[in-house]
Curated annotation (Swiss-Prot):
Presence of keyword Cell wall biogenesis/degradation: no
Pfam families: Methyltransf_23
Alphabetized UniProt keyword annotations: Methyltransferase, S-adenosyl-L-methionine, Transferase, Ubiquinone biosynthesis
PANTHER family recorded: METHYLTRANSFERASE, UBIQUINONE BIOSYNTHESIS O-METHYLTRANSFERASE, MITOCHONDRIAL
EC number: 2.1.1.222, 2.1.1.64
Function, as annotated: O-methyltransferase that catalyzes the 2 O-methylation steps in the ubiquinone biosynthetic pathway.
Top-level division of the source organism's lineage: Bacteria
Protein family per UniProt: Belongs to the methyltransferase superfamily. UbiG/COQ3 family.
GO BP of this protein: methylation
Molecular-function GO terms, alphabetical: 2-polyprenyl-6-hydroxyphenol methylase activity; 3-demethylubiquinol 3-O-methyltransferase activity; polyprenyldihydroxybenzoate methyltransferase activity
Protein name, per record: Ubiquinone biosynthesis O-methyltransferase
Catalysed reaction equations from the record: a 3-demethylubiquinol + S-adenosyl-L-methionine = a ubiquinol + S-adenosyl-L-homocysteine + H(+); a 3-(all-trans-polyprenyl)benzene-1,2-diol + S-adenosyl-L-methionine = a 2-methoxy-6-(all-trans-polyprenyl)phenol + S-adenosyl-L-homocysteine + H(+)
Length: 238
């Protein structure tokens, strides 16, 4: 039997549980996720074509990305997270907005990979790996969940002085875009490190893109620099 507490940071769960009712407040604590969501949705859809696909969103939180993928045409979307309060918010929002073919479950991705291997066309794990003790285990589980002809998407934060200045000093303390303590620089992941995790899990990195934030328009755009936020689009290597 697997250890249900393995790879779960209880402090992170408690942190997001305290603000679970704020997930759909577009000017609140999760404003940056709402700002970034159109870009990551288009990136995923552009590579994988969500129409008619079975999709898994790992670390779905309150359902911002999961719900938008369902609206984009996915046949079925499953969102998983370890913060039950966030999932309650996601379920309520989907029900109130008549979003069908979507479900949420409080389960570790490692356990789901054992129960439902190779069962999803698209697996997304966005802005999540910097919140867990063992991100490599998350990558392996995502690789085990995707179908042989499917795609896996990751997004996270580079680990360097620039990302510390942008996402902790500026975003948390100066501009107050996100609550203090949202990020832990020690958990940030360099692209080379994530690429190594992908290779070891049997995934080929098909595309890498950085994301840059335009303060005046409060929108994100793709860029070539992976100095701060970045995304990977991956395919099974076998």
């Amino acid at each position: 039997m697997s250890d249900k507490k393995y790879n779960v940071d209880e402090g992170e769960i408690a942190k997001f549980s305290r603000i679970a009712d704020k997930w759909w407040d577009k000017s609140g604590e999760f404003k940056t996720l709402h700002d970034i969501n159109p870009l990551r949705l288009d990136y995923i859809d552009g590579h994988a074509d969500l129409r008619g696909k079975r999709v898994l969103d790992v670390g779905c939180g309150g359902g911002i990305l999961a719900e938008s993928m369902a609206r984009r045409g996915a046949a079925f979307v499953k969102g998983i997270d370890m913060a039950e309060q966030s999932l309650e918010t996601a379920r309520l929002h989907a029900a109130l907005n008549n979003v069908a073919d979507i479900e949420y479950e409080c389960i570790r991705v490692e356990d789901l990979a054992e129960a439902e291997p190779h069962s999803f066309d698209v697996v997304t794990c966005m802005e999540m790996m910097e919140h867990v003790p063992d991100p490599a285990a998350i990558v392996r589980a995502c690789a085990n969940l995707v179908k042989p002809d499917g795609m896996v998407f990751f997004s996270t934060i580079n680990k360097n002085p620039k990302s510390y200045l942008h996402l902790i000093v500026a975003a948390e303390y100066l501009l107050k875009f996100v609550p203090k303590g949202t990020h832990d620089w020690k958990k940030f992941i360099a692209p080379a490190e994530l690429a190594r995790m992908c290779r070891q899990a049997g995934l080929d990195v098909a595309d890498t893109k950085g994301m840059t934030y335009h303060v005046l328009s409060q929108t994100y755009a793709l860029c070539d620099s992976t100095d701060v936020n970045y995304m990977f689009a991956c395919r099974p290597a076998f």
